[in-house]
A protein has these predicted regions:
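Bacterial Sec-dependent N-terminal signal peptides
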Residues: 1-35
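Catalytic loop of the DD-peptidase/beta-lactamase superfamily, centered on the K-T-G motif
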Residues: 24-79, 211-214, 220-224, 228, ...
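Alpha-helical scaffold elements that line and support the substrate/ligand-binding pocket
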Residues: 66, 71-73, 97-120, 124, ...
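Glycine- and aromatic-rich loop/turn segments at beta-sheet edges
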Residues: 79-81, 189-191, 235-241
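Short, solvent-exposed turn/loop segments enriched in Gly/Ser/Thr/Pro and often Arg
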Residues: 70, 74, 125, 132, ...
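Active-site-proximal loop and beta-strand segments within enzyme catalytic domains
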Residues: 58, 82-199, 216, 251, ...
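Secretory-pathway/luminal and periplasmic proteins that interact with or process carbohydrate-rich
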Residues: 75-77, 132-140, 150-157, 229-239, ...
Length: 371
């Protein structure tokens, strides 16, 4: 082998090694994490230990913003990992992208319009659209809200398009593309009336259709129907409004990453919010006089023996116990909201670590364990 060829191959090996190292990133070591989390009134030592046992699996700069709701009181607890040390911080007013947890709020808008008799849950959405659905498909509001429409998780061809913006996959999914999909590409992944299939595009179409029903933008509907009445001052789909509060998202390697733009389907996951604001929403869900939230909590579909669907909510069943929940995940953040209406208890968990991190599922588990 000549010297030039040898050095060329050596360089290629070095480049390949560096690419692999960059892709893998540094692995956070749970055993190296130092626990400096402080006690707090209203949060048990067991709960604090659960927070430590979860956060220690994530890289430096990962933080949790947690709200404990009990009856009419709320206790906040913040934690961050820096220099392999876990410490307590005050981040209850910090804004996080909540991802698919936004679907709960889209369903709240649906329930609110239903209470006002502006639509019927069993009504096909076609009546409110100014374009035909492909093959004259009949899809109802309820089916979109409880994931029984038969629509796929993402629109056809989206995977290839998203490769152009891997850190912000929905960035270019504008209204023209959505309308073209609905009229010319829409097809059911499952046509069975008893099938359940989680659908991001279904939630996006629901949010889009609701704007046609109400004659207002998705953001305007959120502010006027939910956020303003509940005094959720730092919740929005317009990130620039809360830019000074935004927590930096981390990808699965622990490096800073961008928030997601949802284009024409904000109803699928565009909201940013705070633990403080989400606690207000949780409390509202315990109000027996809130007709829209009462309607939203009604069971609409039985998935299996372990869980049901309400409008936007998952319902976990354990004997006669029913826990309402929804999680959210993007390329840089992971969230969880858990409610137990019977005992008027709830938990909010916001984090700034990617849903693609191999331990991201521990954050959902933490939400249940803290309840």
């Amino acid at each position: 082998m000549d010297i030039l060829k040898h050095h060329t191959i050596k360089r290629l090996y070095v480049i390949a090694f560096l690419v692999v190292m960059i892709a893998c990133g540094s692995e956070s070591n749970p055993e190296s994490a130092i626990n400096n989390l402080e006690p707090r009134a209203g949060v048990s030592s067991t709960q604090i230990d659960s927070i430590f046992q979860t956060l220690r699996y994530f890289p430096n700069q990962t933080q949790f913003s947690i709200a404990f709701i009990a009856d009419s009181s709320v206790t906040f607890y913040g934690a961050i990992r820096t220099n392999d040390t876990l410490r307590t911080i005050n981040n209850k007013s910090k804004a996080f992208e909540i991802g698919s947890l936004s679907k709960v709020f889209t369903a709240t808008l649906l329930a609110d319009l239903a209470v006002e008799d502006k639509l019927q849950l069993e009504q096909p959405i076609q009546a409110y659209l100014d374009l035909p659905l492909r093959d004259s498909l009949q899809i109802t509001f309820k089916q979109l809200a409880n994931h029984t429409s038969g629509l796929p998780r993402i629109p056809s061809g989206f995977i290839w398009e998203s490769l152009l913006h891997m850190n912000n996959p929905y960035k270019d999914y504008d209204e023209d593309k959505l309308r073209n999909y609905m009229s010319h590409e829409l097809e059911l992944a499952d046509e069975s009336e008893t099938a359940w299939q989680y659908s991001n595009i279904g939630a996006g179409i629901l949010g889009y259709t609701l704007t046609k029903v109400d004659g207002r933008s998705y953001e305007e509907m959120l502010q006027q129907r939910i956020f303003d009445p509940l005094n959720m001052q730092h919740s929005t789909t317009q990130r620039e409004w809360v830019e000074d509060r935004l927590v930096t998202g981390l990808n699965k390697r622990g490096n800073p990453t961008s928030y997601w733009d949802l284009g024409a389907i904000p109803g699928a996951g565009a909201i940013v919010s705070t633990a403080e604001d989400l606690a207000k929403f949780a409390l509202a869900n315990f109000d027996p006089n809130n007709e829209a939230l009462r309607l939203q909590q009604q069971k609409t579909f039985t998935v299996n023996s372990d869980w049901d669907m309400a409008l936007g909510w998952f319902i976990r069943k354990q004997n006669s116990d029913h826990v309402y929940w929804h999680s959210g995940g993007t390329g840089g953040l992971r969230t969880m909201l858990v409610l137990h209406p019977e005992s008027k208890k709830g938990v909010v968990v916001l984090s700034n670590i990617s849903s693609g991190h191999k331990h991201a599922g521990r954050i959902s588990s933490l939400g249940f364990s803290l309840l």
